[in-house]
Amino acid sequence: MNTHEVEELRQKLLEDARKKSEEIIREAEREAERIIEEAERKWREKAEQEREKIITNARLEAQKIISEARRNYRITISKAKAEVINKILEEAKIRLTNRIGFDIEESLKKLLDEALYYIENPSKIIINPRDRDFIKKVLKEKGLKNIEIVESDNILGGLIIESIDGERVDNSYNTRLERAKSIVLAELNIILWGK
């Protein structure tokens, strides 16, 4: 997957997430405003009925109701954020699983180059079974021989290499997605919600 394709995919996912999150946030804000207005209305009614006697209690009650409304608002927003982020990550996982939007051979070349930086002479390479023909071609192009190719359905794609003495570099899509997750979550939080 080249940088341009990654950027296009990233932009599309961000745009979809932005639209969905704005809609969810608008609805949550309307609901929060309604709850706060209702709380303030209740407070005013109580204050008018027993002006001096209950004004202190009414303010405390109003504050509790407003605090609860704000808490519910924060919960709603947090759920909306989590939902949007999970949908983005799920879409990325689907695209990786189905090999949508990128060149698998180029992807494997780049991942192998990165892994070879840490282990120059791997003895084993673990791949998704669908990538067998691609990795054979890549290994041949790089002049790498005597490497055991192990197929595993436990990885979406990408590769894991191991040295003869047990050193391991995990450059599988699963691991890269997890590594990217914390970075993406922080970036999405800033982009979508300004925090």
UniProtKB/Swiss-Prot annotation:
Disulphide bonds in the chain: none
Biological processes, Gene Ontology terms: proton motive force-driven plasma membrane ATP synthesis
Entry's localization field: Cell membrane
GO cellular component: plasma membrane; proton-transporting two-sector ATPase complex, catalytic domain
Keyword Ribonucleoprotein attached: no
Origin superkingdom: Archaea
Protein name, UniProt field: A-type ATP synthase subunit E
Native species: Staphylothermus marinus (strain ATCC 43588 / DSM 3639 / JCM 9404 / F1)
